[in-house]
Amino acid sequence: NVRIIINSNIDLAYEYELDGVHLNSKQLHELSHFPKDLLVGASCHSENDLKVAEEKNADFAVLGSVKKTLTHPDLEPMGWVRFSKLVNKSNLPIYSIGGMTNSDILSSLEYGGIGIASQRAIWAI
């Protein structure tokens, strides 16, 4: 029972009959509506992003950057306390992202997330 969610490309999700798509924050704000027959996740970086994702009926959100990350080296991380405050204002299931490693899974859960999203930590296994 594995679900495959592709990053940012709705057309490929349909072409390869994938389960869903993870939208970047630009797509979150630009799309007038989300596909109803795909799981849809949204990258969020603020309370407003989470509100938009919820209003457009996203299935989940990915919130960060929680920690310093190589992907966005100039971005000031929000930290776990801010992450928790934003999670508590939303009804969406939320994954933490940004500098996450396997050792952050428990922290994400403790601060209200449902898990982590990561690129480098997964490929490093």
Where are these regions (language model features)?
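Short acidic/polar active-site loop segments enriched in Thr and Asp
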Residues: 19, 59, 114
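Conserved alpha/beta-domain cores
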Residues: 1-8, 12-27, 32-33, 51-56
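Conserved, mostly hydrophobic/aromatic
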Residues: 13, 53, 61, 86, ...
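Histidine/lysine/aspartate-rich catalytic loop segments that bind and position anionic ligands
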Residues: 40-43, 47-69
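Glycine-rich phosphate-binding active-site loops on the catalytic face of alpha/beta enzymes
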Residues: 24-33, 62-74, 99-125
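Alpha-helix-loop-beta-strand connector modules within alpha/beta enzyme cores
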Residues: 1-6, 25-28, 32-46, 75-101
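Structural motif
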Residues: 16, 56, 89, 110-112
